[in-house]
From Swiss-Prot:
It comes from Pseudomonas savastanoi pv. phaseolicola (strain 1448A / Race 6) (Pseudomonas syringae pv. phaseolicola (strain 1448A / Race 6)). PANTHER family: COPROPORPHYRINOGEN III OXIDASE, MITOCHONDRIAL, OXYGEN-DEPENDENT COPROPORPHYRINOGEN-III OXIDASE, MITOCHONDRIAL. This is Oxygen-dependent coproporphyrinogen-III oxidase. Its EC number is 1.3.3.3. Signal peptide: none annotated. The gene is hemF. The lineage of its organism: Bacteria, Pseudomonadati, Pseudomonadota, Gammaproteobacteria, Pseudomonadales. Belongs to the aerobic coproporphyrinogen-III oxidase family. Residues 241-276 are annotated as: Important for dimerization. Its cofactor is a divalent metal cation. GO terms for cellular component: cytoplasm. Substrate binds at S93, N109, V110, R111, G259, G260, R261. A divalent metal cation binds at H97, H107, H146, H176.
Length: 304
């Protein structure tokens, strides 16, 4: 393992520890259970799952470090010149599904790939981001989420936040329903336009920003009263989350195609979901406002 890979791995393991500690403290009841695993083809990881807490219904914060002799199709499809290279992939990926429909679901991921071939220079890149999926949107929360994202990107250039915000909006879009999964945030891949140290610093800035972006929203909403109808709507909207993760998500596809650990890959799925045939929200309702106002291509920082 190279010095670069060792540095990334040390950061990711520490990030997983810090995020789990912060989420446990915010929940106040449940604790993460760790399941360390090894991958027969090379590598392993630490899956950490929290369930049935006071705030978190189900959540997972996973670290993985896998390697192999050939990049899987999901990783080489848009870079065919890398087909046949050996690879190492390291990352932390998390999804948090709260009980309360007024608390959004959150997702974050930071990852590092390096593809190598004897006699040639290694090719490396970073990817990741974070995004928010509210069920009952609150503008204050959306602005806060995007403000933290913008500030994390600011030291790396004025164009970084708008570019990766737009990429997030494009990526987390359910094409078969023509609707966004949530209110976005940041998404990026193939980050190597800077030197390694700057690229690594950028990834650390994004990874470290997640808790600052998410926990203030959780604190504001976790005690809000909700009805059985609102809970049903949350479960209905979770169906969209499942659809995206199983049909489009690059991380899910990479994990399954590379022989990753299925339980760890699918820990992102919510525990209770519902689908209703051709269900539509009542006009003028809070549920209708989610898609009409919040799930749109919006610049949340334009007037704030």
């Amino acid at each position: 393992m190279s010095t670069r890979t060792e540095a990334v791995k040390a950061y990711l393991l520490d990030l997983q520890d810090r995020i789990c500690t912060a989420l446990e403290q915010e929940d106040g009841n449940a604790h993460f259970v760790e399941d360390a695993w090894t991958r027969p083809a090379g590598g392993g990881g630490r899956t950490r799952v929290i369930e049935n807490g006071a705030v978190i219904e189900k959540g997972g914060v996973n670290f993985s470090h896998v390697f192999g002799s050939n990049l899987p199709p999901s990783a080489s499809a848009h870079r065919p010149e890398l087909a046949g290279r050996g690879f190492e992939a390291l990352g932390v990926s998390l999804v948090i599904h709260p009980h309360n429909p007024h608390v959004p679901t959150s997702h974050a991921n930071v990852r590092f790939f390096i593809a190598e071939k004897e006699g040639e220079e290694p090719v490396w890149w970073f990817g990741g981001g974070f995004d928010l999926t509210p069920y009952y949107g609150v503008e204050e929360d959306c602005v806060h989420w995007h403000r933290v994202a913008e500030r994390a990107c600011a030291p790396f250039g004025d164009d970084v936040y708008p570019r990766y915000k737009a990429w997030c909006d494009s990526y987390f879009h359910l094409k078969h329903r023509d609707e966004p999964r949530g209110i976005g945030g940041l998404f990026f891949d193939d980050v190597n336009q800077w030197d390694f140290d700057t690229s690594f610093a950028f990834i650390r800035a994004i990874g470290d920003a997640f808790i600052n972006a998410y926990l203030p929203i959780v604190r504001r909403r976790k005690a809000a009263a909700y009805t059985a109808q609102q809970r049903e709507f949350q479960e209905f909207r979770r169906g969209r989350y499942v659809e995206f993760n199983l049909v489009y998500d690059r991380g899910t596809l990479f994990g399954l195609q590379s022989g990753g650990r299925t339980e760890s890959i699918l820990m992102s799925l919510p525990p209770q979901v519902r689908w209703g045939y051709d269900w539509k929200a009542a006009p003028g309702s809070e549920e209708a406002r989610l898609t009409e106002y919040f799930l749109t291509d919006r610049d949340w920082l334009a007037d704030n």
